[in-house]
Amino acid sequence: IVGGVSVAIE
């Protein structure tokens, strides 16, 4: 997931 805080779990 790119474009948010969720980028940390990529």
Curated annotation (Swiss-Prot):
Organism, scientific name: Cordyceps militaris (Caterpillar fungus)
Temperature remarks: Optimum temperature is 25 degrees Celsius. Active between 15 and 45 degrees Celsius, however activity rapidly decreases after 1 hour incubation at temperatures above 40 degrees Celsius.
Main location: secreted
Location of the protein in the cell: Secreted, Extracellular space
Regulation: Activated by Mg(2+) and Fe(2+) ions. Inhibited by Cu(2+) ions and EDTA. Activity is unaffected by Ca(2+), Ba(2+), Zn(2+), K(+) and Mn(2+) ions.
Domain of life of the native organism: Eukaryota
GO terms of biological process kind: proteolysis
Free-text function comment from the UniProt entry: Hydrolyzes fibrin.
pH effects: Optimum pH is 6.0. Active from pH 5.0 to 8.0 at 37 degrees Celsius, above pH 8.0 stability decreases rapidly.
Top-level EC class as recorded in UniProt: hydrolase
Any single Gene Ontology cellular-component annotation: extracellular region
GO molecular function ontology, one term from the record: peptidase activity
Family classification: Belongs to the peptidase S1 family.
Protein name as catalogued: Fibrinolytic enzyme
Alphabetic keyword roster: Hydrolase, Protease, Secreted
Keyword Protease attributed: yes
Enzyme Commission designation: 3.4.-.-
